[in-house]
């Protein structure tokens, strides 16, 4: 890189992916500043909160690769912009994906704004995705070359301005190679396991966590025919397609097939369950989505043949855009989709290009 080095602020979590991201950019000649985000305040002494250790890992990595690092607290922004929505969605009977909103509102908004205040031209994260500028000058979000690790689904709510200032160095690299690089350069966290759980909240038991914030009320579990087969502990604790944890594994009711959560009747506090993976109540030929966001800069045309994901790691499903306007999207699938879940994101793709999407209704 000729001339003065370009300044890039890297979101460093203490994990392997963001650590290798910082090292790669340093090798490419960037002036790298590491930024550690603390976005959750409660239960810092909990066995499930690793914030202190994550920060120590960031400091150790930064010292090894020779970059400056600082910590910033976005807990207020997270609770206001992400967690409040998370609770509203669960209260309404939907199953939200907070990682999607966290990316749009925290990692690529609050974080980006802070990075710009530090004089950075771009930011970078350890996400597995790619960005390129097309001939028309628009920026495109693409799947990672390693499709098994692709995270473009979680990034579909970014806008063109955010995308234009973002680097994803790992988008061209297989995850196995990232681990190899970490070991080769002696990163102290080279063998650290990947994080899971709710964005920034960690891996604590979800039911216990949610129960602290939402009032719950037990109610009946019914079949589509109206037969009561059990009792649920609160509708917020269940999601469509759920098989484990519904308490009917040993039930003698029905035909012996596995039970699945099929619908929630919020008005009557009733959970509907069905037997069999391919029960008609679990299959959706057409979905509607709202709260649309188009990272591509514009929506697809009605009638366009696309592919869609209705959950992370799902294989692309062939679909047609039946209708689209500023507020609503309707998708028709070539094959009915299983357990399409209100609150999750429906994300559209044209090949490897992520166009955007909306919240399933």
UniProtKB/Swiss-Prot annotation:
One GO term of the biological process aspect: tRNA wobble position uridine thiolation
Protein residues bound to ATP: 11-18, 37, 126
Annotated disulfide bonds: 102-199
Region (Interaction with tRNA): 149-151, 311-312
Catalytic activity: S-sulfanyl-L-cysteinyl-[protein] + uridine(34) in tRNA + AH2 + ATP = 2-thiouridine(34) in tRNA + L-cysteinyl-[protein] + A + AMP + diphosphate + H(+)
Annotated stretches, region: Interaction with target base in tRNA: 97-99
A GO molecular-function annotation: tRNA binding
Record keywords, A-Z: ATP-binding, Cytoplasm, Disulfide bond, Nucleotide-binding, RNA-binding, Transferase, tRNA processing, tRNA-binding
Catalytic site: 102, 199
Thylakoid is among the record's keywords: no
Pfam families reported in the protein's UniProt record: tRNA_Me_trans, tRNA_Me_trans_C, tRNA_Me_trans_M
Lineage: superkingdom: Bacteria
Function recorded in the entry: Catalyzes the 2-thiolation of uridine at the wobble position (U34) of tRNA, leading to the formation of s(2)U34.
HAMAP family documented for this protein: tRNA_thiouridyl_MnmA (MF_00144)
Protein family membership: Belongs to the MnmA/TRMU family.
Protein name: tRNA-specific 2-thiouridylase MnmA
Encoding gene, per UniProt annotation: mnmA
